[in-house]
Amino acid sequence: MDRIKKNFGFGCMRLPMIGEEVDIEQTKQMVDAFLDAGFNYFDTAHGYIQGKSEKALKTCLTSRYPREKYILTDKLTANYFKTEADIRPFFESQLEICGVEYFDFYLMHAQGLVNYDHFKECRAYETAFELKKEGKIRHVGISFHDRAEVLERILTEYPEIEVVQIQFNYIDYDDPAVQSRKCYEVCRKFNKPVIVMEPVKGGNLVNLPENAKAV
């Protein structure tokens, strides 16, 4: 497994904006500070910021640093393919947009009961494993949003999955809708490394209400 330095990632679902466009100069400063601090893991998806996240990463990261300097995760999202034949061209377009020849991690995005059936019908997992054999993906994983029993089914049916991204924070730990703890326990059962998303719940866990700030 590629070495993720200091176990901390730069998520690109949200980036600084000027109006409707990514603030490129501020994002460059953030990327530089992140790498200078010894971190190296970046996470994006094609739909983030209406397709602007991947483009910003090419401008701010991949065109400015050698490939070995960073670890890049991208994702396959259900609404970008209808058939198996759609997947490979979409993947190749992601490589081009991001300005790289391979992804360190490629995740089947937002897996849950409904999405998973679509991915299975279109042989998305099989296509990803083929791309890994071709050297265009180093590690295949999933990002997951559903009940623990669904996660167990996926990991049973596709033991080749190498890593699982789950929502994990103290609010969602025992939330019956999110089931962070139970999902984490399933990952442990199957000996799968975990990548945490939403550790501060989109900033909500660090944005104090006014009455708390006054204390």
Task: Place the predicted regions along the sequence by residue.
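N-terminal binding-site loop/beta-alpha segment at the start of enzyme catalytic domains
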Residues: 1-70, 101, 127, 133
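Structural preference for beta-strand elements that scaffold enzyme active sites
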Residues: 5-9, 40-41, 69-75, 102-107, ...
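Active-site mouth loops of central-metabolism enzymes
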Residues: 13-25, 75-85, 114-117, 211-213
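Short, acidic/polar
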Residues: 21-34, 82-99, 146-156
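Generic structural signal for well-ordered alpha-helices
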Residues: 31-32, 54, 58, 88-95, ...
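Structural motif corresponding to the early beta-alpha repeats
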Residues: 48, 64-85, 109-110
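Active-site groove signature of glycoside hydrolases
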Residues: 95-115
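Beta/alpha (TIM)-barrel catalytic core signal, keyed to glycine-rich beta->alpha loops juxtaposed to Asp/Glu
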Residues: 111-215
